Amino acid sequence: MVADEDKVFKALADPSRRQLLDGLRRKNGQTLSELCEGHDMTRQAVTKHLNLLEEANLVATAKRGREKLHFLNPVPINEIYMRWIGKFEQGRVQALHNLKQALQEKDQ
């Protein structure tokens, strides 16, 4: 699990890869040519970044005839959210609830 998370963090560390993921979030199922159109990168650079995103399981692919379609896989990002962010969010929500109750009691 840790090795998989390391791959995800490494993949997300690069702004170009985050841009590719954002592009897939806006329009899922793009070809390499479509992904190249929206970015100021060479075809080879986009391919390299997509391969790393695939290794991190952030992008899944499917063949359609001669084309290879790329799809965003949000599961690894959600797993990181649940492990690293979700736990901290729970305390924050509880603190806001306690503050609300204290203010309501003060008004009474």
What is each stretch, according to the model?
Residues 10, 22, 54, 60, ...:
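A cross-family signal for key residues in well-ordered alpha-helices
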